[in-house]
Swiss-Prot record:
Pfam families: MIS13. The lineage of its organism: Eukaryota, Fungi, Dikarya, Ascomycota, Taphrinomycotina. GO terms for cellular component: condensed chromosome, centromeric region; kinetochore; MIS12/MIND type complex; nucleus. Its main location: nucleus. This is Kinetochore protein mis13.
Length: 329
């Protein structure tokens, strides 16, 4: 067998074959002939699949035949249970679902997953405690879990949701916004109760102030009635000699007592009105005082503009000279 000649192109050797004489002659004839022309053409693409492709798709849609390929590489834990043995220890528990046969029904798959995960957790707990002080308590807990798993294997505990009663009501999970709204209702109801208590306290204070005003008025009327009775007694019957020196003292105390009583009633009324008015009255008084101060300040500034300092000093010197001359005289 003859080797094809090699040509060096840089550092790469390319092996080329011999060109046929017919192809060279055909190329030269096409290039030499000026009458030949090239035309572009369109090739239509198929819009739909061919009948054979359609038939193959229909065949693939059907259920495939049962194959023994799915059963390869699986170990049976026991013949009676029908469940597979635990996966390898290196397989993490969150990937157990990948090793469960897809041919099983959903209840059996969840049962298989529950058995695998529980067995793996028991083994981890056994390695964790070992011979520690809590080993005996952990062993008791593991024995209880193992009994539950044995009952699950013996089909004494059912995890199938197909056998539940048809009228069973499944509670819906509460919406997070509803939980927040319930919490807000509790907070606002507590706030409303506090406000009601404050309102009741203020109403009690107001009722006490009104009752105190009424008691003062009734006391004042009683004093006036007593004074009127005493005046009538003075006019009708003379006083005994023992009470004669005390008359001037009582007559002197009467006007003071009336004035003190009026001042007390006025102060109580003022305090009550200020308590009811609250911060609005204080803010209004402060606003008026600030306005008066600003107006007074502006008037002083405007007056100082028109006053001449030299004339002011001259007037002060004349006043001091006149006062000194008057003192010398």
């Amino acid at each position: 067998m003859k080797r094809k000649p090699e040509e060096q192109e840089g550092f790469v050797f390319v092996r080329k074959g011999k060109e046929k004489a017919g192809s060279k002659r055909r190329k030269s004839s096409v290039e030499d002939d000026p009458d030949t022309s090239q035309t572009d053409g369109l090739v239509e693409l198929p819009v739909s699949d061919t009948p054979i492709v359609k038939r193959n798709k229909e065949l693939r849609k059907g259920k495939g035949r049962r194959s023994s390929l799915d059963q390869r590489g699986k170990r049976a834990s026991s013949i009676g249970t029908g469940f597979e043995a635990l996966p390898h220890a290196d397989v993490p528990s969150h990937e157990y679902y990948r090793h469960i046969s897809k041919d099983l029904s959903e209840p059996l798959r969840i049962k298989q997953l529950l058995l695998w995960a529980s067995s793996k957790a028991l083994e981890e707990q056994r390695k964790k405690y070992g011979e520690t002080e809590e080993a005996s308590e952990a062993a008791i807990a593991r024995s209880i879990v193992q009994e539950v798993l044995n009952e699950l294997l013996a089909n004494k505990v059912s995890v199938s949701w197909y056998q539940r009663p048809p009228d069973a009501v499944i509670p819906n999970k509460p919406h997070p916004q509803n939980l927040k709204n319930a919490q807000l209702v509790d907070e606002l109801s507590a706030k409303l109760t506090q406000l009601h208590n404050e309102e009741a306290a203020w109403r009690a204070v107001a009722a006490n102030s009104v009752s105190s005003d009424k008691s003062i008025l009734s006391f004042k009327k009683a004093v006036e009635s007593i004074d009127s009775k005493q005046d009538l007694d003075k006019q009708d019957s003379p006083l005994p000699p023992d009470d004669a020196p005390e008359l001037p003292n009582i007559s002197k105390l009467k006007p003071k007592f009336h004035t003190l009583l009026d001042m007390l009633a006025e102060n109580i009324h003022t305090l009550h009105s200020l308590t009811n008015a609250g911060p609005e009255v204080r803010s209004s008084y402060g606003r008026l005082a600030a306005q008066d101060f600003i107006a007074h300040r502006k008037s002083l500034l405007s007056f100082s503009k028109y006053v001449d300092t030299m004339n002011l000093l001259r007037l002060l010197s004349e006043a001091s000279y006149k006062s000194s001359s008057n003192e010398s005289v």
